[in-house]
UniProtKB/Swiss-Prot annotation:
SUPFAM superfamilies: FKBP-like (SSF54534). Residues 49-117, 164-297 are annotated as: Disordered. This is FK506-binding protein 4. InterPro entries: NPL, PPIase_dom_sf, PPIase_FKBP_dom, PPIase_Fpr3/Fpr4-like. Its main location: nucleus. Inhibited by both FK506 and rapamycin. PPIase that acts as a histone chaperone. Histone proline isomerase that increases the rate of cis-trans isomerization at prolines on the histone H3 N-terminal tail. Proline isomerization influences H3 methylation thereby regulating gene expression.
Amino acid sequence: MPLAMNLWSLTLLPGQQYPTYVRRDFQITNAALGEELRSKDGRSVVKVTHNPISQSMLESDDEWSDEDEDEEILSEEDDGEMEVEEVKQKKGKKAEKVEEEDSEEEDEDESDFEDELEETNVLCSLTAGKTEQASLNLTFVRGEVVVFEVTGDNVVHLMGNYIQQDEDSDDESDSDFDGEDDYSELYGSDDDLELDSEEEAAVAKITEIPDEPTPKTKKALPAADKKPVPEAKPAQKRKAEELESPAKEDAALSKAQKKKLAKKAKVEGEKAEEKPAAAAVAEKPATKKEAKAPQKKTLPSGLIIEDIKIGDGPVAKTGKRLGMRYIGKLTNGKQFDANTSGKPFSFVLGKGEVIRGWDEGLAGMAVGGERRLTIPAALAYGNQKIPGIPKNSTLKFDVKLVSIN
């Protein structure tokens, strides 16, 4: 049974055609008249021109890759049939030839486009005041090209969902599975994350930050303890010699003057010991500041946002297309979805293409940043039962923003 994902919609204006190349599997479930009716009793007929096209027909079989060109050139050089300059000239000519062939193929594809779309079918008929909406169950798979249109005077809205088709269990366990352009893209995730120990890696990144200055502090403390020992002793010894030297040179030096000199030597020795001790104390608050805990806040909706790493790139705003990496888990630690390699998941923020917890939790995030979102059921799938996600489940996502378009 297909798994319904984020929303799909299309608004049909009378008299216009809407060619659509299906990049992700989707299902149309409802057609309805618009809020404002141009014709109070007019009849609107929704039609689709449909003809599946295999993926192989959309891709060029004659494309030249750089590796193919290099292998051919190296082979010719080894045979001694071409000089270096001739190789370069041939490569340039082939590149021009490839561009011309690609251009001709594109023109042929465009010219054949109209001929390939042969079948036109009526999806439903809507009449204002009588039948203003109709339930549908139509599925369009990746690689198809369809054209939607409506006849009549009223606007019609088509609604549905992107879907995840059933796959083998082996494919589902692979992080880089075949449905990457549909289900994997829904949430998305950088290649530096791993499926089995993602949370531990994220925590390790945080704890390593305050641990870096710790060895410096430990090394500085013994050094501070050692410094006053050699400095204080020579100072005291020097002052003692100064006491003895005047005593030998000038026997008339009074006892009061000797005591004064001895006291001065003692004070200087204590100051020498206090300076490194104060430096060691000053290092401790600095270490505490560096070991700053991750920023965590709870929104009125119950969504908990924890900034693991603050990014330094562009900031995510409503209407921007984000590229994401992510790992989704239940509160018991069981992972139900992830995107950690391949093409990052791409979606437009704030347009309802993902669950509300993502639309709210990713706003204000900067490229390069990492967050942990704890999303209550009301902002996720609610009481819906989805494979791998029980009803009324609180979800946890470790997300990383990798791009903004």
